[in-house]
Regions:
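Hydrophobic N-terminal alpha-helices or hydrophobic patches in metabolic proteins across all domains
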Residues: 1-181
């Protein structure tokens, strides 16, 4: 244990985050049976994401309706696990949990960053629908490259902002405590 504490804080953070990411990805991408509880929860989540995203798209295209994990309209979309942003949320959660901050600060950070990432993903799905209708030749590159990277960058950005704010908050609390305030 002394060896671990002697390592630089950045090293400890990176190792913790990597271990948590491996654990989260293992749970997320494990090959569950269709009737298992995790598989049923994931399918319900994908259906919920399809309903919310379809509702946003329906604001601009009245032909849109949702059936399970399908957004149907002028450019049908099927919401699958890779569309769910759970991998980006897992990255965000792993880094927040690995970061040296109080449980309360981590919970606030996860709630705020998770909501931002989730909202961005809903917007991403809506934009992909529009791109599929208006610019079908761009759809694949937007879907597989641009928007996928954007989602990861939003999660990383949320972490960076949260880490800076939580670090500043910790420094301010430490200064207040040492000054007797």
């Amino acid at each position: 244990m002394r060896w671990w504490r002697a390592r630089p804080g950045t090293f400890r953070f990176l190792v913790r985050a990597a271990v948590l990411m491996a654990a989260f990805y293992s749970v997320l991408y494990y090959s569950y049976g269709d009737a298992s509880l995790p598989a049923r929860v994931l399918v319900r989540y994908l259906g919920f994401l399809a309903r919310v995203s379809g509702g946003v798209v329906a604001l601009f295209d009245s032909s849109v309706r949702v059936d399970g994990v399908f957004i149907l309209g002028r450019r049908p979309l099927r919401i699958v696990l890779d569309c769910a942003a759970l991998d980006a949320l897992a990255l965000f959660a792993a880094t927040v949990l690995a970061f040296p901050a109080s449980a309360r600060v981590k919970l606030i950070g996860f709630a705020a960053g998770g909501a931002i990432s989730w909202g961005f993903n809903v917007m991403r799905i809506g934009l992909l629908y529009v791109a599929g209708v208006k610019w079908p030749r761009l759809f694949d590159v937007l879907h597989e490259d641009v928007m996928a990277l954007s989602l990861v960058l939003v999660s990383v950005g949320c972490f960076a902002v949260w880490a800076a704010l939580s670090r500043g908050n910790s420094a301010r609390l430490a200064a207040d405590a040492s000054s007797g305030a």
